[in-house]
């Protein structure tokens, strides 16, 4: 049950499937002090937003549910969980930031972050690590709290799981986005 003191707004989209476009729509339609999201296949995590709000009320600007901090984990198929873990390690090393889970995108943040941090609203999940990178470089405090990623109920739960070609396609897009993020930051 959600905390009655906090108000939540849910936006349902039926046509566009782009994660980045969902983010753009969400932030244009929201008016609260905190902005966050999670995919509908993870809606059981909504009550954890109350924990995230408490973190924001203390000393954090962005709170991420992370698979790669103590207490978190990844229960998906071995190929998916290992590739995600090693991609996050690779991204963290290349981007030189301490965030351990750059691709989970279950988060809550203070609205003020959007006043300074811009992002390019295209792509699948790769726009999120660019957003986190830019927020970190501007000095915003990012806190990760543990999250156990459950096994996908079916292949349609993931954009990358249905076949290996698609899996590697998204992997290449993510790697390209890492390097373009660095180049944009230098300009």
Where do the model's predicted regions map?
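Acceptor/aglycone-binding surface of glycosyltransferases and processive sugar-polymer synthases
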Residues: 13-29, 34, 47-125, 151-172
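Short loop/turn motifs at secondary-structure junctions
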Residues: 7, 31, 59, 139-141
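A short, conserved beta-strand element in the Rossmann-like catalytic core
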Residues: 41-43
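Anion (oxyanion) recognition and catalysis
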Residues: 4, 57, 136
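C-terminal catalytic/acceptor-binding lobe
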Residues: 139-187
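Catalytic donor-sugar/metal-binding loop of nucleotide-sugar-dependent glycosyltransferases
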Residues: 97-98, 123, 132-150
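Acidic donor-binding segment of Leloir-type glycosyltransferases
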Residues: 1-11
